[in-house]
């Protein structure tokens, strides 16, 4: 992403704004939905469900002119959201339900210093997600040990 004409101050302001806009979604995705879904589904499937809803949540942006979404295809975006939600699932569970790491993960996705998305990014995400799921297969396919407390101060794990 090139530096805006107004200088570095504009990019710092944008980063500060993005620190709240995207990551605030994590209160809903990981703070509420993930723990509730993990009470009934293995973390892998909870993440896949969240990723699907997360992608659909952004669907209206694809119809707004002037947004980056307007130039993208929805299907690769949806697949990317599903893989990202699955990727953040072991982060969330390893952090015992803390929202800090998922929020930082979300923020780095929309960080204006990263290069623009490329068509092959989805394939890279699929490969990385497959590897992460395989490396965490004991915890990704079983509800035991997953965080199930909803936005509480102390996270609880499914016994």
Please give the residue ranges for each predicted region.
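Juxtamembrane helix-entry segments on the extracytoplasmic side of multipass membrane proteins
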Residues: 1-15, 66-80
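Residue-level hotspots within the lipid-embedded alpha helices of multi-pass solute transporters
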Residues: 18-23, 51, 55, 77-82
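Structural signal for the C-terminal ends of transmembrane alpha-helices
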Residues: 23, 92, 130-140
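Aromatic-anchored segments of alpha-helical transmembrane domains
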Residues: 51-61, 106-115
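Functionally important transmembrane alpha-helices
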Residues: 72-131
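Membrane-interface capping segments at transmembrane-helix boundaries
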Residues: 134-152
